[in-house]
From Swiss-Prot:
Intrachain disulfide bonds: none
Record's protein name: Pyridoxine 5'-phosphate synthase
Entry binding sites for 1-deoxy-D-xylulose 5-phosphate: 8-9, 43, 48, 98
Reactions this protein catalyses: 3-amino-2-oxopropyl phosphate + 1-deoxy-D-xylulose 5-phosphate = pyridoxine 5'-phosphate + phosphate + 2 H2O + H(+)
Subunit architecture: Homooctamer; tetramer of dimers.
Gene: pdxJ
GO MF annotation list: pyridoxine 5'-phosphate synthase activity
Amino acid sequence: MLLGVNIDHIAVLRQARMVNDPDLLEAAFIAAKHGDQITLHVREDRRHAQDFDLENIIKFCKSPINLECALNDEILNLALKLKPHRVTLVPEKREELTTEGGLCLNHTKLKQSIEKLQNANIEVSLFINPSLEDIEKSKNLKAQFIELHTGHYANLHNALFSNISHTAFALKELGQDKKNLQAQFEKELQNLELCAKKGTELGLKVAAGHGLNYKNVKPVVKIKEICELNIGQSIVARSVFTGLQNAILEMKELIKR
């Protein structure tokens, strides 16, 4: 299984002081050496990664670059100019802390944007909710790749197997009934497996990501139809204590098959 290392949160730390440290390009070199792909989200509001970050990483790194971006003309034109290996189209809301759900596949610009990127020899992935309907739509839109949003799975795992329910970060809508949480967790894991199988049957390459960490990744790794995981925040958080290289290598060991 391949690991895409999302280095957005290195940029978050840099932007907190509006300085050039930590150096995102240095992080990209480490991710390129020890991971399989560099994933970078250039948001409309440029809250962390900047245009020059993407340009430098594409210019100087040998690894495949997976650019996450919204259906924004300015950023799509940047992608067409710089030509990352892949563009993963994601939804985006200015007020969100992180990407909260899958892409709306009924967007009028979507098909046209996919065609433009593919005509420039850029692979296109769609970041979608794990639903059979969205997988069928992705196939009809002629995307080559899908990335299943694992956020709900990750939230359920946290609620079940950590103390988050007793902290300020608890998701109250999940409730605290362990039996109910366990049933939801098992159902969501089965759903991810079903969706991954459906995507593979339709000829799509299947990735997964969002909220995956060192404690919850193993069950997802067992879904053999998923060929790639894109993981960022948990790796960067671990790197504070172990260093980025060790954090990546530890995750690589966990996702070995």
